[in-house]
Amino acid sequence: LPYCAEQGKGVFVIDTFYQARISPEGLLFDGTFFQDPRLRQELLFLQKIPARKAMSELFRVKSDSLLWLLGRRWMAENMAVALEYSYFPAEWIPDFSQELCKIPWERLFAQRHMPPSRVEQTVQGICVYGQEALLLQIQEGSGAFLANQQLLAENHRVLRYSKILAQARKVTHYLKDPISK
């Protein structure tokens, strides 16, 4: 089924998310999305940053803690399909490296005795500008999907917080709800 989203007085039906023919379910960005053999990642940056108040509260760590910030671009058939910005406390995986970036998040945290139980995510449509438009290989002001995602442990502790920008392709707008009564 295509992904549907209400927008104003109409319903947008997104027939295909990516020209690279990745399934709409991929927008969930779960472990299966990142293990898709059609995808390859390009590391943009990997750095430690100080945790701001909101992030230290989100991860339940001290306010002077450091976070890993990972930026990467996901490519399929030489086309950018998504940008990922992920945060997690550096004290949980102090030896995080470019090599460990290749391991799916679920497996990485499970190896560190912090098995994830679920992913919570909100998705909204946005317009992309500047560096992010360049990295996604789209025109400034083009539409994209922004997924705010949290990987949670069984005790509801947030293990990883990510912002994922994904290209939207081939959108059809219906002026009337096709499921009208």
In which residue ranges do the predicted regions lie?
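Hydrophobic beta-strand signal
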Residues: Y3, W68, F145-L146
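Residue-level recognition of beta-strand microenvironments
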Residues: L46-K48, R73, Q150
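Exposed, interaction-prone assembly regions rather than primary DNA-binding/catalytic cores
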Residues: L58-V61, L66, G71-R72, E84
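HTH-adjacent hinge/linker in prokaryotic transcriptional regulators
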Residues: L1-D64, P94-R118, T172-K181
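A short glycine-rich, His/Asp/Glu-containing loop-to-beta-strand
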Residues: L39-L44, L70, A76, A80-S86, ...
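C-terminal regulatory/effector modules of DNA-binding transcriptional regulators
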Residues: R60-S63, A76-M79, F88-W92, S97-K181
